C-alpha cells in the first residue's frame, strides 16, 4: 500500500500521508496501527471498504445487505481436545479463508450496521469470538494507519508469551505455523 510514517518504525516522521500508495483489497490480511493508540500494531482481515455497510447477524458477516457465503467444514480441535466449529467464508471478490466460532452467542455475533467512511476500512479477525477489531474499540481504520499487507507468519507462540522468552519455547512454540504463507 506504499509507505507511510508507520512503515519505518525506528525513524522520525519524515513525511505526512503515503508515498507510492495503492489501495488494499477486500480480504487482505493487513498490519495496521490501532487508531487512537498508534504505538500498537494490529493484524486483521480487511472485510469492509469505504462506503460499505457491514453487519454481523447470528454470527454471519453481511456486506451491503448480503450475507457472506459461509460453509461449515471440519471442526478445529483445540489443544485440550475441545472441538471448535470452523467455517470457510468466501467474500464477494472470491477471497476465501477459515474462521472459528468459539461460542455461538458472543458479543460480536450480532452487531449494529456499520457504514465505512471514506478513507477508512473495516477489519475483522478470523478468530471472530476472540478478536478485538472494528466491531469494537478498534473502529474504522484510516488509510494512513495501514502498515502493509501481511504475507507470512514468521514466528508463532501460544497466547501472551514473548518470542524473547526462549525458555518457554519447548511448551509454547507453534512450529506448524512458522513460515506459513498467508493467502
Regions found by a protein language model. Name each.
Residues 1-183:
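Soluble "head" domains of membrane/secretory-pathway proteins
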Amino acid at each position: 500500500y506504499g509507505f507511510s510514517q508507520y512503515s519505518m518504525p525506528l525513524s522520525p516522521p519524515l513525511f505526512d500521508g503515503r508515498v507510492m500508495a495503492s489501495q488494499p483489497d477486500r480480504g487482505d490480511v493487513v498490519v495496521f496501527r490501532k487508531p487512537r493508540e498508534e504505538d500498537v500494531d494490529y493484524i486483521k482481515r480487511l472485510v469492509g471498504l469505504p462506503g460499505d455497510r457491514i453487519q454481523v447477524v447470528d454470527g454471519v458477516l453481511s456486506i451491503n445487505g448480503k450475507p457472506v457465503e459461509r460453509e461449515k467444514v471440519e471442526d478445529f480441535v483445540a489443544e485440550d481436545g475441545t472441538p471448535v466449529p470452523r467455517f470457510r467464508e468466501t467474500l464477494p471478490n472470491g477471497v476465501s479463508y477459515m474462521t472459528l466460532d468459539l461460542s455461538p452467542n458472543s458479543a460480536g455475533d450480532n452487531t449494529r450496521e456499520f457504514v465505512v467512511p471514506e478513507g477508512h476500512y473495516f477489519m475483522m479477525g478470523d478468530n471472530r469470538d476472540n478478536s478485538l477489531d472494528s466491531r469494537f474499540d478498534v473502529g474504522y481504520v484510516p488509510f494512513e494507519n495501514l502498515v502493509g499487507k501481511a504475507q507470512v507468519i514468521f514466528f508463532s507462540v501460544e497466547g501472551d508469551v514473548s518470542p524473547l522468552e526462549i525458555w518457554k519455547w519447548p511448551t509454547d512454540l507453534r512450529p506448524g505455523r512458522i513460515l506459513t504463507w498467508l493467502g
